[in-house]
Amino acid sequence: MDVKIELSSYVRVLKLASTPSWNEFSQIGLIAGAGIVFVGFLGFLIFAIMTLLPGGV
């Protein structure tokens, strides 16, 4: 395993990477938040259906 080659590839990737703008950052935050809310709502919906059905948990 050649550590020097691996480190140079990591450095190359870090040089290409850039800090996201505020618009990109807020858009990513909104999309991630919407996904979290959706998964939570889906879990609550499944829980509510299982509770209302006879023989549910």
Curated annotation (Swiss-Prot):
**Chain ranges passing through the membrane:** 30-50
What domain of life does the native source organism fall in? Archaea
Keyword Transmembrane helix tagged = yes
Q: Where in the cell is it found?
A: Cell membrane
Gene Ontology cellular component list: plasma membrane
Q: Which UniProt keywords apply?
A: Cell membrane, Membrane, Protein transport, Translocation, Transmembrane, Transmembrane helix, Transport
Q: List this protein's GO terms for biological process.
A: intracellular protein transmembrane transport; protein secretion; protein targeting
| Database matches in InterPro entries | Prot_translocase_SecE_dom_sf, Translocase_Sec61-g, Translocase_SecE/Sec61-g
GO MF terms listed in the record are: protein transmembrane transporter activity
Q: Could you tell me the membrane topology recorded for this protein?
A: Single-pass membrane protein
NCBIfam families in alphabetical order: PRK09400.1-6, secE_euk_arch
Q: Which family does it belong to?
A: Belongs to the SecE/SEC61-gamma family.
**Subunit and partners:** Component of the Sec protein translocase complex. Heterotrimer consisting of SecY (alpha), SecG (beta) and SecE (gamma) subunits. The heterotrimers can form oligomers, although 1 heterotrimer is thought to be able to translocate proteins. Interacts with the ribosome. May interact with SecDF, and other proteins may be involved.
Q: Which HAMAP family match?
A: SecE
Purpose: Essential subunit of the Sec protein translocation channel SecYEG. Clamps together the 2 halves of SecY. May contact the channel plug during translocation.
Q: What is this protein called?
A: Protein translocase subunit SecE
